[in-house]
Amino acid sequence: MVEKQTDSVGIVEAKTVRVVEVDNPLKLVSGKTLAPIDVTYETYGTLNSAGDNIVFICHALSGSAHAAGFSSEDDKKPGWWDIMIGPGKAIDTNKYYVICSNFLGSCSGTTGPSSINPQTGKAYNLDFPLITIADMVKVQKLLLDKLGVKQLLSVIGGSMGGMQVLQWAIEYPDFVKSAIVIAATPRLGPQAIAFDAVGRNAILADMESGRPTRKGLATARMIGHITYLSKESMREKFGRELKSAEKYSYDFSAEFAVETYLDYQGQSFVDRFDANCYLYITKAMDYFDLERDYGSLRQAFAKTKSRFLIVSFTSDWLFTPAHSEEMVNALVAQRKPVSYCNILSPYGHDAFLLEPETLGRLLSGFLSTTFAKPKFDKPAAVSSIRGVDRAIRLRVDYELIESLIRPNSRVLDVGCGDGLLLLNLQHDKNIDAEGIEVDQELVLQSVDSGLDIIHRDIERGLEHYPDGSFDYAVLSQTLQTLKNPHLVFAELLRVAEKVIVSFPNFAYWKCRAGLFFAGRAPRTKQLPFRWYDTPNIHFLSLRDFEDFCREIGAKVEVRLPLIGNRQSPVKFAPNIFAEQAIYLTSRK
């Protein structure tokens, strides 16, 4: 019996609609045709009067249209993403109208290998035509056309669902306002294809009368499930523990806990999934390759109009963070709006199903700010602009940086913290803002504010940004923490017309006095750290920075030596009496 839950969509009814009639078959990428095609889907929430609150969910390999809620009063297990979809949840059904459909080729209501072939009156089985991700998305579009949907607020999907999201954004740029791609890849690499091939071979080697039996599918599922887990999660969950005994049995039974776990996953899977569908779906994944289809990844994204959120997980070794960063780099190169976060997680590829708090915050903030522009209230001061920077940053610092930036400019803030400077600039100067930040928590805050933020260490470079991408780049209180400031600064001068830099002055008289009289590493209000916990690794003065600019061929256009919260620059002996400084620089 389903208990009433305030955060559940409750009991939902799956619906099936015909999107392709017998007399008008759909032409597939392979050149084959298919008809008829039925699609099963579920909806949650309420469509608003403007019809602009629709979120479409794309499920992964073994998923279905049943993403949230319960199928009946007696249903004990909610939908596969119930943890994310519902009233007050990340995908809030009090705000959004959510649609999830079973994709083409699956076995949960939509036409696939287990469906009846109208020409034979029997299941298609291996007579079903080969399909691709593009075919699946085309059928999803036919469904939404049938439902009268004019535009999607967002398309969201994890793993194989993320591949569908990419196809959506590329093929229907005017239809998709935003795209959320989670734990996905622009193409399967040879390792992933190899795992799929072994799984298919296990199924095809276990055929009786032309039909696969349960054993092959169970083995394929076990192989696949290994790729969904991380080494850390397997070690933590299983280690080398035995199932029930303390000693080895010295036979071929399942003794280790991890063996029994995989046995359970395999056996439970065959009770709800069709082996032929598994063959077709994994082959469709193998065929997915945006570079092959569009010439290059950059070219694939050339015509997209969506706002993108790309999410990866640190321990995912199936579709690694490098795969996600490759997509981010291509979007950046095409100057498309994109946010990226690499979530710290021990759960491997399955983390998109197991990290509701962090992933939920990302989705909630991104969706909310895509749906409606957030209201910005200017704070009086800033405290902790970086996770490692406990120094109090007074608003005067931001106001002076703002004064150096023209209205309607394109600005990149490197080490942007919680994004407050960019938000101020958006509010006051109507800038086009982008940020880069290494701290995960601050990335979450920035996305929640509606900014386009990339989760990355700036020292890895900006090579994917074209020359002159920005009018201004801002490096605020970060220069002294960089391992290679020369490389970073040179890159900033390449991608931006002007670079604004602020940093603490380590030649400030209190620093000198502390070192001279106390014989200890100096500490001031601007530099509150002890020697062992400071993020600062370079101890530069105003003179040092100006020498540095001359060496690399940078022109100093404006110098603002500052002390405390005074807006007026220090004029007398600034290298001694300035606590910090702001510089506006450019290429000579």
Predicted regions and their residues:
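Alpha/beta-hydrolase-fold enzymes
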Residues: 175-176, 181-268
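Catalytic active-site module of serine/aspartate enzymes centered on a nucleophile-bearing elbow/loop
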Residues: 341-379
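S-adenosyl-L-methionine-dependent methyltransferase catalytic module, highlighting the catalytic core
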Residues: 487-491, 498-588
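Conserved alpha-helix/loop element of class I SAM-dependent methyltransferases that forms part
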Residues: 392-408
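Class I SAM-dependent methyltransferase SAM/SAH-binding core
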Residues: 420, 424-461
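A short SAM/SAH-binding and catalytic strip from SAM-dependent methyltransferases
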Residues: 472-483
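N-terminal cap/lid subdomain of alpha/beta-hydrolase-fold enzymes
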Residues: 42, 46-117
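Short beta-strand/loop motif that positions the catalytic acidic residue
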Residues: 310-312
